[in-house]
Amino acid sequence: FSWDRIVERHGHLAAIRESMLGLDDLPPATRLALIAKLSDTLAQFVVARRWLSSDRAERIVVEARDRSAINLATRSRGDETGQLVLHLRATGQLTAGLILRALLSGNLELFDRALVELSGLPSHRVAALLYDRGGSSLDALLTRAGLPSSTFPAFRAALDATNEIGFVGTIDGAARLRRRMVERVLTRCEADPDVSEPLLILLRRFATESAREEARVFCDQLVADVIDIAPEHQRIAA
């Protein structure tokens, strides 16, 4: 049987989706296709109820899909990441916005693989062009990959920030660092009079999302600390 065929024919059925999403060995590309089906179903529902406009519902769906793609790519290993990139390209989801989100999220493997796929260049050549500090090589690579030139300043600023502040491995650290990355890129792009307004709008959305995620992680950690401390206080009181 084919996972893709099942998703295509029955992915709109909640029972089928839930059963498949509960499988530990479900390929990431198939999992993302199911998430896309669910997102489309929810978008159609809220638009039909006139709770959201079709434009806003579509934007929310795209952002949710992109976040899911980044999360799945982070948990993928080896060929799974490559298959996920192929799926993203085949479904029109391998966009400049997704690739920029991957870079700002610290997922350098997805970022590199996406550019390898879109440019048609071998991975070692892409790596050499990406990290050539001259600047023109990066523009040439992004152009070959078919990304809009209006997004180049953000990619350049993000790579510079990556080289300057790097990434750390903990969940909490990644949240803080991601916010620093986004804010640094946004600040640099806002200072450039040639940067397009749509790019600034996208970066501001990323900034809001990263700040919200950092606050969530902080609150989760605070609650966990309180839970850990409570039994000790009870023993002392006794």
Language model region names:
Residues 1-238:
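Alpha-helical scaffold segments
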